[in-house]
Amino acid sequence: MRSYPPLAPPDTHCFAAAAGWLGLGNPREAEAELDAIRPEFQQHPDVLDVRWVVCAGQDDWPAALRVAQELLTTAPDLPSGWLHRSYALRRLPEGGGVEAAWNALLPAYPQFPEEQIIPYNLACYACLLGKLDEARDWFHRALKTSDAPRLCAMALGDEDLQPLWPEIHKLGQVKA
C-alpha cells in the first residue's frame, strides 16, 4: 500500500477541528475547517475521507460522489474510495441506485479480499437486487474476514439483509 505524506500544522489543526465539528454533529463547520486546509493538501486522502463524511452528513450525494471519485483517483489503493463511491451511488437521486453501487464496488473485492465491509456491502446489494444466492456467498465471504458473532449481530439489524435473516440465525453464530 502506498504511503501518503502526513498533514502538518497548521493543516493538522484544521483537520482535527473538522473531525471535532463532525463529532458534534455540525458538518457545515467541519466543511469550513476543511476549506481552510492549504490547497496543496486538499487532495490528501485523509482530507478527502473527512470531506466525504461531511457531504454524506448533509445528504449531498452528488457532492459525496465527486469526493469519492477524487479519493479513488488519488488513492486507488485505499478501500475507502471504493466504499464511499458505492455508498454515494446507492443514494444518488438520479443516475444511481443499488445496481450502480453493486457495479462500482464489485471490482474492489479482488484488491481488498480481507476488507470485511466490501463483501458485506456486496451481500446487501445482492439481497436488494434479488440475487439471494450471490448474497449468501458474499455474506459468507464477509464472515471469513471478521468476528462472526459481531457481524451476524450487525446483519440481523440490517434491513438490506432481511431476506437472509432466517439463515443468519441458523448459522449458530448469534443467539436469537
Labelled PLM ranges:
Residues 76, 127-128, 132-150, 176:
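TPR/TPR-like (Sel1-like) alpha-helical repeat modules
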Residues 7-46, 50-57:
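Alpha-helical segment of the N-proximal tetratricopeptide repeat
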Residues 6, 40, 74, 111-112, ...:
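Structural marker of alpha-solenoid helical repeat scaffolds
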Residues 49-61, 66-117:
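Alpha-helical adaptor scaffolds
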Residues 19, 53, 87, 124-125:
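Residue-level recognition of tetratricopeptide repeat
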Residues 1-4, 149-176:
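Terminal, low-structured helical/coil segments at or just beyond the last alpha-helical repeat
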